[in-house]
A protein has these predicted regions:
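Sec-dependent bacterial lipoprotein signal peptides
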Residues: 1-5
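A non-transmembrane, solvent-exposed segment enriched in polar/low-complexity residues
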Residues: 7-155
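Solenoid-like repeat scaffolds
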Residues: 156-160
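Amphipathic alpha-helical repeat scaffolds of TPR domains
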Residues: 162-168
C-alpha cells in the first residue's frame, strides 16, 4: 500500500422507523469514553428515515440515543448498516458483527420468552385437570433445560467473540 493510504474505514447507517413519535427528532450515536457518553454522529428522523455516515479508526460498540434515552446498541464498523426501529423490534444488520449481535439478541429473547411461557403452561395444565405435583415436576425439568440452553448459548457467544467488541 502507498504510504499515504488511510487507516480509517467508512460506515454508513441507513435507518427506518415506524415509530411516529421519532419523526422530527434527532438521533445520536454515542460512545462511552472514560465514563462519559460522547456524541459521534447525529441525524434527524424525517418521514421515518434517517442516515449517518463517517469515518472510524477502529470497530467500536456505540449506542443509538434519542436525547438522553438509549434506544439500541450498534457495532460501528466499516460498511453499510441497516437499522430498523419499530414498536416491536430493534435491529441493526448488514455488517458481520451487527448481524451476529442481533442474531444473538433475537435467539436470547426467544429463550427468555419460552421460559416466561412456562407459568402460563402450568396454569393451562392445571385447568385441564392435571396433577399439580406432576405438572410442577415436568415444568421444573423444562425450565432447567431452557435455562441451561440459554446459559450455554450466552457462554458460547462470548467465547466465539472473545477477540472482538462483542466479547466480554
Amino acid at each position: 500500500l502507498p504510504f499515504w493510504a488511510s487507516c480509517t474505514s467508512k460506515y454508513k447507517i441507513e435507518g427506518t422507523s415506524s415509530v411516529n413519535s421519532l419523526d422530527g427528532k434527532m438521533l445520536y450515536l454515542k460512545s462511552l469514553r472514560d465514563g462519559e457518553w460522547v456524541k459521534l454522529d447525529s441525524a434527524e428522523v424525517v418521514h421515518g428515515l434517517f442516515s449517518m455516515k463517517g469515518k472510524i479508526d477502529s470497530v467500536q460498540m456505540v449506542t443509538l440515543y434519542m436525547d438522553e434515552e438509549s434506544i439500541m446498541p450498534i457495532v460501528l464498523e466499516s460498511g453499510k448498516i441497516t437499522v430498523t426501529i419499530s414498536n416491536t423490534d430493534l435491529k441493526a444488520v448488514g455488517t458481520s458483527l451487527n448481524n451476529a449481535l442481533y442474531e444473538f439478541i433475537s435467539k436470547r429473547n426467544q429463550l427468555e420468552e419460552s421460559i416466561g411461557e412456562l407459568e402460563q403452561k402450568e396454569t393451562r395444565m392445571v385447568l385441564d385437570g392435571g396433577d399439580l405435583d406432576e405438572i410442577h415436576g415436568q415444568l421444573v425439568v423444562e425450565g432447567d433445560s431452557l435455562m441451561k440452553a440459554m446459559n450455554q448459548y450466552v457462554k458460547t457467544f462470548i467465547s466465539d467473540n472473545y477477540e472482538n467488541v462483542l466479547g466480554p
